[in-house]
Structures are given as C-alpha cells and as structure tokens.
Amino acid sequence: MSSKHATETARRRTFAIISHPDAGKTTITEKLLLFGGAIQLAGTVKGRKAARHATSDWMELEKQRGISVTSSVMQFPYKGRIVNLLDTPGHEDFSEDTYRTLTAVDSALMVIDVAKGVEERTIKLMDVCRMRDTPIMTFINKLDREGREPIDLLDEVEQVLKIQCAPVTWPIGMGKRFKGVYHIHNDAVHLYSPTHGGKIQHGEVIQGLDNPRLDELLGGQAAELREELELVMGASHSFDKAEYLAGRQTPVFFGSAINNFGVQELLDDFVEHAPGPLPRATESRTVDPAEETFSGFVFKIQANMDPQHRDRIAFLRVCSGTFSKGMKVHQVRIKRDVKISDALTFMASDREHVEEAYPGDIIGLHNHGTIRIGDTFTQGEQLIFTGIPNFAPELFRRAHLRDPLKMKQLQKGLQQLCEEGATQLFKPLTNNDLILGAVGVLQFDVVAHRLKAEYNVDASFENVNVQTARWVSCDNARKFEEFQEKAAANLAIDHGGDLVYIAPTRVNLQMAQEKWPEVRFHATREHGVAA
C-alpha cells in the first residue's frame, strides 16, 4: 500500500448520530460542523419559519416539519483528521434508511436527552449497532435544562442498553445551576459560557479539582462536585479504549449542544479514539481498507438533491483502494464497466466534485436508473458486500391519481422515489394497480408531498387489501412456474424486478407456505443480491 493511501486512510473517521426524535441530534450535527469549521453560522432548528434552516435538514418537507427524514452526508477536517458525518432520519418511520446508514459507518454517537433518558428509538438503534459491534460514544444533552440525576442516567444506559459507561466529562449542576463540566481525564473544569448560532466562545478553564479559584467561582457547588466525583469514580468504569473499540463500553460526555457547550470536548476525544476505516465482509472474503484496488458499496439513493436538476445521487462508501476522478470501475450486479468523472463529495446540500476519495469517504454517483441500493463497485473483482438489508413493508396503500392522464409521470415518480429505499413499489401481475409499501404512515405523506413538489403529480394513497409481503424464490424451476401460474392473483413485481407474494391476511400467507413447501418466502432481502 502506498504511503499516501495509508496516511489518508488512517485520517478518516466515519460515523453516524443515533438518538430518539427531539434529543437534539440535528443541533449536535450542526455544532460538530461549526466546531469543525465547516459552517460559519449554525441555523438553529427551533426557528423553523426562519430563513436559515438546519444545514443537514435540507429537503423541503423536512424544513416544514422540523424532522430529518433522509440521511445526508457531511465531511469536514478537524485536528488533522477528515471526519465524515452521516446524518440519519430522526423519525421512526424511516428506520430502514437509518439501518442502512449504520452499515456504512465505523462508529456512532448516541445522543440522550438528560430529562428523558434512554428512549425506545435509541434502544432499537443500539440493537442494530450491537449486531455489528459498532463502537459508541454518548453525549447527554440539554444540561441547561432540569433533568434526571447523571448517575441515574448512567445506570439506566448500563441496565437497558447493556453497555458499560465510562464518564469522560461530568456536569456541575444542571438547569439554572448548570456551571460547566469537569473533564476527568484532563483534570480540568470548563466553565459554562452559553453562546448561540455561529459564535464559539470558550469559557474559563480551571486546571485541577483542588484549585481555590474553583471555590471562589462556584461557592458551595465546588465542594458538592468533589463529593459527587468521589462517588462517581468509585462506582463507574474508567475509559478502556479496547473495550470501547469492541463495542462493550461507551465514553460519556455531558453538555448543551444548543449553547455550543461540551461539544468540543466530545469532538477532541472522538478524533483521538474513534476507529478509522474497518475491514468489510463480502460474500466471498473480507476486504481490508489497506488493499490497493478500489471497492465500495451503495447504501443509499437520494432523488432530487438539487430541484433545479432532476437528479438522483447514489451514496457510495469507499471500502478499499483510492477512488480518483475519471476512473473506470466495474458495477458487479450488471457486470458493466463505467467511467466516473463527476463523483461528488458533500457538505449537506453543497456539492463539490471529488478528485480523490479514500476508505471511509462517502462519494455521490449520478444515477440514471442503473444503480441500486446494495450495488458493489470494484476494479474488476466479482465481490458483493453483504449486510445491507431490505425489509418487507408493514403498511400498504394503492396510489390514486386525480388526473388519469398523468399515469406516466406517476409511474416514473414512484419508481425513482422507491429507489431511495424508504418505500417499496409493487405492481400486481393481474391488474394495473400501483401498490406502495412502507414501514410507517409518514412515508405515504412524504411520497405524496414529493410527487406534487418534484413531479407535479397530484396523487393520494388509499387502503388496499394487502397485509404483508414476502419475496419468493425456488430451486425447482418447474415447481416455481406452477406456483406462479396458480398464485398469480397474489403475485407482484417489485421496483427491482423481483417476484413478491402479497398476502391479504397472515392466514393467507401461512396457507400459501403450507401449500407450496418448495417455495421460500423471505421477509428480508439483501440489497444487491436477488432473493
């Protein structure tokens, strides 16, 4: 491996933020970008009507509702490292998109609201991280408000999320009594100095817990802090890098992201300790980031990042080798060589053309309908990266057009929006219905809104007699043909061209499985791999 490739790979830190909605994920995303020098002015998310919206929530509907529904990617340099931050949807209906984003990162940051503690969505996301032993750092947010006792929160994280907590910073009071944090490793008190927006103002730093200046400024709270810390140090774990990298321990930081406080301490430790690019599993072997030849996989497709150009961008995670502009790469699924001269890098919606990209980087490829989620790109080797799932939807609706003459635009719009992977399109074999499947109700609203805004199609979604769907496959070609003839009324083609059994009831599905034992019914399907 060339020394430049080795150096650049070692500099990369690629991570995502996970949290329950409203724990402050978008705010902390903004502040990380602010401290990383990537944006001059953080647009606070609360002022949704204001002209400045949070940088990472760039799609129109997100701006209206104040929730992030698509993962965007932001890159910024910090202390000699290159940080790739993947923002994930904050709404539970978009769990599949979040799940796939978590396949493209090497570590994660968990944000917890000090008043609410561990919430349901956080538990689900942690389960996903645990499946891959993803290293996790934790930021307990909103210390400028009243909340629960920090020691109780650590206990809850340990009990509910089954991960050891190692506090790195410790809060001095909270709400009106919030005075700052004590950095355990550096033996320094960082005094709270709230600033908003783009101002970074560093409060006074007092070296040493026994410094008389502390008593002078904090009065009785200084003695309280010393007492509390004695208790904390005795009851909690001290930071162990090997345990953190194995996904068994989480370093914990406290702060108030909206007030730009406590974020820099987190970022400093993150670039120091978080893992660089890790090896990746394929169907045939494990790919090491140090390998010379380029490889990567697509974990997300986003339509219309630029409403002026009706474009679709495929987000590719570089896994090995160096990507350089104008390079010829091999798209494994369709066995086609393509030259890529206009790949993009991201600063939320601002796009710049890539000259070179290294393992850990995320690049955007222009997609004209030929790239799918899960696609592997290499320099010729027939590799398929694994672990990028497609889930069977839980809710189904039939598309209803207000103007029947717009059928062509509706089909095109649904096909393109479904390529993003948050919703799935099914075309029954025996009628002309267009059935949309989703994980949650919000997705139908999003699709209707985007059809109107981006394709000028006025459509609504009505109930349809479908309760569940399964991808079907069979090794016996004759039996499969017979099954397709006899069960045609329940079969549909999905937007990837695969055959799906759509069942009106769970009982119907059970009966079909009993009647056709040779046919396999799949609840999930690997992207990039036919069922």
UniProtKB/Swiss-Prot annotation:
Gene3D superfamilies with a match to the protein in the record: P-loop containing nucleotide triphosphate hydrolases (3.40.50.300), Peptide chain release factor 3, domain III (3.30.70.3280)
Residue span(s) of domain tr-type G: 10-278
GO cellular component, one term: cytosol
Binding sites annotated in the UniProt record for GTP: 19-26, 87-91, 141-144
Function in brief: Increases the formation of ribosomal termination complexes and stimulates activities of RF-1 and RF-2. It binds guanine nucleotides and has strong preference for UGA stop codons. It may interact directly with the ribosome. The stimulation of RF-1 and RF-2 is significantly reduced by GTP and GDP, but not by GMP.
Database matches in InterPro entries: EF-G-like_DII, EFG_III/V, G_TR_CS, P-loop_NTPase, PrfC, RF3_C, RF3_dom_3_sf, RF3_GTP-bd
Domain of life from the UniProt record: Bacteria
Family: Belongs to the TRAFAC class translation factor GTPase superfamily. Classic translation factor GTPase family. PrfC subfamily.
Name this polypeptide is given: Peptide chain release factor 3
Location of this chain's protein in the cell: Cytoplasm
One example of a Gene Ontology biological process annotation: regulation of translational termination
NCBIfam families the record matches: prfC, PRK00741.1, small_GTP
Keyword vocabulary terms for this entry: Cytoplasm, GTP-binding, Nucleotide-binding, Protein biosynthesis
Primary location class: cytoplasm
The species this protein was found in: Thioalkalivibrio sulfidiphilus (strain HL-EbGR7)
Gene Ontology terms, MF aspect: GTP binding; GTPase activity; guanosine tetraphosphate binding; translation release factor activity, codon nonspecific; translation release factor activity, codon specific
